């Protein structure tokens, strides 16, 4: 559980970001000039850990980094970071040979800062977010596969901006807006670097279930956030016939769950490529799927 002060600053940042006319909503995230600059970058952290442990074999490296909740792995294109580095419940004095790893992890997770050029309010808000959600740090600079124009973190912020700008988002109750905000921040939290990752909705939902334990919220709220994350790829599964409209309707019939997923799907599509062509390619399918599934949901709710 994180402190009340960190929690309050986290939610205050999100509340400020969603306000009409906020610096966040007025920022052109699609610009090539927009970037999230870390004082201690993800890439530097990976290189420092690799250099520090270069004389250890793979099993020894895994054992050492595992103490801190992460692993350094060689992917198809990149040396990548898996997991979420942390020094929680660890004392540097007790770690002997791992003490230097402790200091690198502490610098990356607890002492790090984000800078966004010419965006002082958004810089402050993002630093409040990473204090409560340091897992987000692992996404900054994490390259996606070739279809995407943005790293995972910038993509996530663009999705959040698209969600908060959506007309239907403004009509949602406060709790639904909060759930959708948290779902967006973690919807790609486990996405693999530099490759297509079909498992990430399920894996991200699973990890989010653990990450959300740091917040004092009811189990039903956590479950709803994880439901949104697990099904944020509903459009692809609908379009490819992987999941039937009836199955979607049964799973997503409660409250505003499907409406929130439609808002998320549109923002997600628009946040893939700078030129917007990915959204143009699938917007008709999105509309068709939304109509079909909504009709079945209406029938189920009416018959209940």
Can you say where each PLM-predicted feature lies in the sequence?
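Acidic/His-rich, divalent-metal-binding segments that scaffold phosphate/diphosphate chemistry
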Residues: 87-195
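A generic secondary-structure signal
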Residues: 13-16, 162-166, 211-214
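Exposed alpha-helical structural elements
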Residues: 9, 48, 100, 104, ...
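Divalent metal-dependent catalytic cores for phosphoryl transfer on phosphate-bearing substrates
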Residues: 168-274
């Amino acid at each position: 559980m994180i402190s009340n002060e960190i929690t309050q600053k986290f939610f205050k940042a999100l509340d400020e970001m969603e306000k009409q006319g906020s610096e966040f909503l007025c920022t052109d995230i699609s610009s090539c000039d927009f970037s999230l600059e870390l004082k201690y970058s993800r890439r530097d952290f990976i290189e420092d850990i690799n250099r520090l442990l270069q004389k250890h074999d793979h099993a020894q490296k895994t054992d050492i980094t595992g103490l801190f909740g992460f692993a350094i792995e060689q992917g198809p294109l990149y040396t990548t970071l898996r997991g979420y580095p942390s020094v929680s419940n660890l004392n540097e004095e007790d770690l002997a040979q791992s003490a230097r790893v402790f200091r690198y992890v502490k610098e990356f997770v607890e002492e790090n800062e984000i800078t966004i050029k010419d965006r002082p309010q958004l810089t402050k808000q993002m630093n409040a977010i990473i204090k409560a959600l340091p897992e987000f740090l692992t996404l900054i600079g994490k390259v996606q596969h070739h279809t995407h124009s943005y790293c995972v973190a910038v993509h996530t912020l663009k999705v959040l901006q698209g969600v908060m700008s959506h007309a239907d988002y403004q009509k949602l109750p406060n709790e639904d807006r909060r759930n959708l905000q948290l779902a967006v921040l973690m919807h790609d939290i486990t996405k693999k670097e530099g490759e297509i990752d079909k498992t990430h909705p399920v894996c991200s939902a699973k990890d989010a279930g653990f990450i959300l334990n740091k917040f004092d919220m009811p189990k039903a709220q956590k479950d709803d956030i994880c439901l949104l994350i697990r099904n944020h790829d509903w459009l692809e599964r609908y379009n490819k016939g992987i999941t039937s409209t009836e199955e979607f309707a049964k799973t997503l019939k409660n409250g505003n769950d499907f409406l929130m997923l439609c808002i998320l799907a549109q923002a997600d599509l628009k946040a893939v490529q700078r030129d917007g062509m990915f959204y143009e390619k699938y917007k008709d399918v999105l509309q068709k799927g939304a109509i079909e599934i909504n009709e079945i949901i209406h029938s189920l709710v009416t018959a209940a």
